[in-house]
Amino acid sequence: MSNWTPAADQKNQGTLEFEISRAQVEEGLEKAFQRNKNQVSIPGFRKGKVTKALFFSKFGEEALYQEAMDIVLPAAYEAAVEEAGITPVGRPNIEPVSMNKGEAWTLKAEVTTAPAIKLGEYLNLEVAAEDTAVSDADVDAEIKRLQDGQAELVLQEESVKAEDGDTVVIDFDGSVDGDHFDGGQANDFSLALGSGQFIPGFEEQLVGHTAGEDVEVKVTFPEDYQAADLAGKEALFEVKIHELKRKELPELDDEFAKDVDEEVETLAELKEKTAKKLADDKEAAAKSAFEDAVITKAVDNASVDGDAIPDAMIEEDVHRQVDQYLGQLQQQGISREMFFQISGQTEEDLHKQFEEGAATRVKTNLVLEAIVKAEGIEPSAEQVTEEINNLATQYNMDAEQVRSSLSDSLLKHDIAMREVIKKITDSAKAK
């Protein structure tokens, strides 16, 4: 039994009072007892052999209330939510109302609910489509990029003056007001002029100089420089240029083509293959941009009850984005601690970074879910099985592992979201 009472003074807030039946309580107490009986020592009984009745007479059933609650609460809360017909977001604040011995338990939850969505037009929308044509200039630019990738850095004579795009091998020693600072010194450092690798003004002052020269470089650290003790300060770098290297590009001929792509024999074949790849890439990018534009227009056409996304939904989205981001880094071998050490960011910084756009992400999800409901999209059991098999193949896992780690409701949600995006995109027209 559950009772939902909306808050009188706050939208999307309310109190859900619900009951955990005595049978559920007994089930939770039994499971909690089985987990703990091996830890209990009572004279006259071997460990693990104490009866539940004796345990309760000595310690009271209240000793297991918290663990029993942890066991039965999730299912009881989910059932109460379903009965009340609400859609909670974020973590509810749940407190006991009564937990009397031998009786059912009554609890209340302070709940934030998802706001109602009023849909606007979402089918047959008109949005701009990107041009997918590939010009000769596009192909030439890509061939030039491939040519640059095959370039060799060739050591120049001492009489040759450095130009933008050259690479210099330097020693440098930086100081502020005569004091040297951490990170301001290096030997045999390779610097590509014009790369923007150093603070503004540094690389430009090496242009026109030759190998063997000593150069004084004067710069001002940016006001927002990451090292606060250097931000906005003038610095002097004493630079020694050891070597000057310049790119030498390979000839654009059949040999170059074969070096770049072993599947072609001539430069003409390479250009033809490049044109096809550029066309495929443009087509994919245009399709993605068109889909994004359709979703954005459908979301803009919809309105949120109260015109505001609840803070709990924003916080939940940010936490999810942060966890996903750090999880992806973890898969690449970069731990949470390592990331914060390398980046110089704090967890709070990362949360602020993901706060930008959170309201849009949440509204987009709410609108798409509302369209799913309006269109009666309900993925079948066969689609869920297919999704599990696809995920198992993608992540090289057993299908049963995937099934046990992901709920049917989550899988159905993902399938439905893809279906609704396809539906509104397929109905849209390019203008």
From Swiss-Prot:
Reactions this protein catalyses: [protein]-peptidylproline (omega=180) = [protein]-peptidylproline (omega=0)
Keywords annotated in UniProt: Cell cycle, Cell division, Chaperone, Cytoplasm, Isomerase, Rotamase
Locations listed in the record: Cytoplasm
UniProt GO BP: 'de novo' cotranslational protein folding; cell division; chaperone-mediated protein folding; protein transport; protein unfolding
Domain PPIase FKBP-type: 165-250
Signal peptide interval: none
EC number: 5.2.1.8
UniProt GO cellular component terms: cytoplasm
Keyword Cell membrane in annotation: no
Principal location: cytoplasm
Top enzyme category: isomerase
Functional note: Involved in protein export. Acts as a chaperone by maintaining the newly synthesized protein in an open conformation. Functions as a peptidyl-prolyl cis-trans isomerase.
Domain comment quoted from the record: Consists of 3 domains; the N-terminus binds the ribosome, the middle domain has PPIase activity, while the C-terminus has intrinsic chaperone activity on its own.
Family statement drawn from the similarity comment of this UniProt entry: Belongs to the FKBP-type PPIase family. Tig subfamily.
Name of the protein described by the UniProt record: Trigger factor
